């Protein structure tokens, strides 16, 4: 059987079933997802060559994955800087932000220009929007999406390249073109349109019964790895 690519409804259903049927908590899955993202980044963009990472976080769970990834990347020898234009006023996200602050991870208030990003960073982690995204991009995020579209820096996108349709992929030719896509739990249909160099699967937490129910046919994670190349 081939690896299954999920449509938007299937992605939402799988997520909800992890919470309701399998009793995972949001922070539990977010920690595992963000950690797997950090490991995928480290495999593709070693800290020796790409130490400075701009981590762009959105308002939902995708942004939470980015905050977790930033914390772990800081422990792996990277220097992450967080751009979080619309922080989520929920204890989970406030705690994740606080953890980053306590680990001396800096943040920026304004979205860097293309030129500033080119001089100050080596890589951008795109953790803006996940599989629940529906266009258009809200005003708070227009500047950072334009940065992602225009930058020459390599981009690592968490689950969905920001601005893409979860099923159809790019909506315009100028949409984000990440070098690394980290699909979480299972790849979404838009990943079929990914043309970048690196595609990894992260989120090593899917119960076998859930895999069978949805026919996910996920690849085997090698050894003790937290992500697997697709």
Swiss-Prot record:
Its EC number is 5.1.99.6. Keywords: Isomerase, Metal-binding, NAD, NADP, Nucleotide-binding, Potassium. K(+) binds at residues 62, 126, 162. (6S)-NADPHX binds at residues 61-65, 130-136, 159. One of its GO terms (molecular function) is nucleotide binding. Its cofactor is K(+). Transmembrane segments: none annotated. Coiled coil: none annotated. Pfam families: YjeF_N. Binds 1 potassium ion per subunit. PROSITE patterns: YJEF_N. One of its GO terms (cellular component) is mitochondrion. InterPro entries: YjeF_N_dom, YjeF_N_dom_sf, YJEFN_prot_NAXE-like. Residues 11-218 form the YjeF N-terminal domain. Catalyzes the epimerization of the S- and R-forms of NAD(P)HX, a damaged form of NAD(P)H that is a result of enzymatic or heat-dependent hydration. This is a prerequisite for the S-specific NAD(P)H-hydrate dehydratase to allow the repair of both epimers of NAD(P)HX. Belongs to the NnrE/AIBP family. This is NAD(P)H-hydrate epimerase. It comes from Drosophila yakuba (Fruit fly).
